[in-house]
Amino acid sequence: MVSKISPFDVRSALSTAAPWAAQRLLDRGLLSEQVAAPFIEEDGAQGSSLSRASLAKAVRLSVRMLAQEAPGHSVEVRVPPFVAVQCIEGPRHTRGTPPNVVEMSPEIWLGLASGMITLEQVQAHIDMSGTRVAEIGNHLPVARIS
């Protein structure tokens, strides 16, 4: 049996990773300075570095929280190299490449999971295939932080 993921743990991990994600999204032109500012510490130190373990924890917990809150097997969410889950009710996928896949970078996922950005804002920067992938937008953010 898989243990239930705590929303507190997800918020804590996202809060730790938010400055890093905000700085990366700002650098990529996907986030305005005004939106990024509350997430990036004044000295900028936290925005420039984050341990791989902390990044992995934030990504894994938040993606798994999505799967917990939107159970199912019709859409696969991938955030390489850290995690891939199936979620959203619907036809079950069992072999080969799933028909509905969304794949994105860790910083984009963390921005979506924490409410910094919306799926519509970054749609051109993520790989989406299938008719049901946009349904993950109905379950975002996973945990709003500010």
Positions of the model-derived regions?
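Charge-dense, helix-prone N-terminal extensions
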Residues: 45, 63-64, 146
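Short, glycine-/small-residue-enriched flexible loop/hinge segments at domain edges that mediate gating
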Residues: 51, 78-80
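Negatively charged, low-complexity tracts enriched in Asp/Glu with abundant Ser/Thr
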Residues: 33-57
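Mature extracellular/passenger domains of Gram-negative fimbrial/pilin and adhesin proteins
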Residues: 79, 86-101
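A generic structural signal for short, non-catalytic loop/turn and secondary-structure boundary residues
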Residues: 70-72, 80, 121
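A glycine-rich beta-turn/hairpin centered on an aromatic-Pro dipeptide
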Residues: 53-75
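Residues that cap or initiate secondary-structure elements
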Residues: 66, 83, 132-134
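C-terminal interaction segments
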Residues: 1-35, 97-146
